[in-house]
Structures are given as C-alpha cells and as structure tokens.
Amino acid sequence: IIIAADTSMGKTSLAIKMAMNCGCPVAFYSMEMKKEQIAARMISIASGVSSNEILYSRLDSGKIQRIDKGVAKISGKPIYFDDRGTSNIETILSSIRMMKIKYGIKGVVVDYLQILNVNMKSSNKEQQMGDVARRLKNIAKELDIWVIALSQLSRDNQNPAPTLSRLRDTGQIA
C-alpha cells in the first residue's frame, strides 16, 4: 500500500494511527524521525495534546492528566520502532524478517520511500523506486504481512491536486 501526499499533509500521523489501531504487531521504520518523536506523536494522537508540547514540556496539570490517559491507552500496543535512520533497503528487509520471527509482526510501515537506497546500478531514481516497491511487495507476500510505504508527491504548481503522475520518482509503482 502506498500512501502519498505533499509534504506536511499528515502521512506519518495517518500511518501511526493505522499502526495503533490495527490490533496487531507492527514494525515501524522511520528514516527521518527518532522513536521519541514518533512516541510523542502517538501520545499526542491518544491524548489530544500537541506533540510539540509533549516534546518540549509545555504542560499544565490538565494536559499532564490527558497525557497520562493517552499513555494508558497506548501502553502495550505492539509497535516496534526502528529509527536507526538506515536507508538501505537490504538492512530494512533483513530487519523485517527478524521482527517477523521475534515479534510475529503482521504489518510494516516504511516512512518514507524516497529516502531508501537500493544497491543497484540503475541509471535513474524511478527505476530504483520501482525496485524498492517490488521488494517490499515481495516481502509482504513472503511473510504474509501488509506493508505501507509513505511517499512524497512532487511539486506541481500547474496542477496542485494529487495525481499518480506526481508520485515523486515512483512512476514504476503507480
């Protein structure tokens, strides 16, 4: 599954909500955010307190109570974060296999597709992204799991509406 949108449109938050609500073990690979930032987003989603307030301790007693309730809601959710920032697809695929064995994951979130590196001498980024998408699809089939990959849309001042042609560097996955 590819979730694509412009920058700062909520792709990561949507993926976090999906992982929190699926009721199954999920591996979450973030190339941009540390697990503390993702945890703050999870607590924010569960409590209604902004993640910036949580991260920077701008909290009054009412917000602290809401955070406590939010933490209680998400405690024990089987979400396993890999925030090493590795952008090597081989490393991620190996980690997915390990998490399937160790935790019994049923799903994977990859945030985000364009940051991943492929060990191939492809002439262009579009072919590399096609290879990444194919490999993620193959691992999903191999391990009987679902995979959600987040993707940026390229900017198009002529047509700001989201379209398949705006999937940045990913013409082969559309």
Region roles according to the model:
Residues 127-174:
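Phosphate-binding/switch region of NTP-binding enzymes
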Residues 7:
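The conserved Walker
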Residues 13, 17, 21-104, 118:
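Cytosolic-facing regulatory segments adjacent to core modules
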Residues 1-3, 27:
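Short hydrophobic/aromatic beta-strand immediately N-terminal to the Walker A/P-loop
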Residues 10:
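Conserved glycine(s) of the Walker
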Residues 113:
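Conserved Walker B
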Residues 117-125:
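Conserved ATPase-coupling elements of RecA-like P-loop NTPase cores
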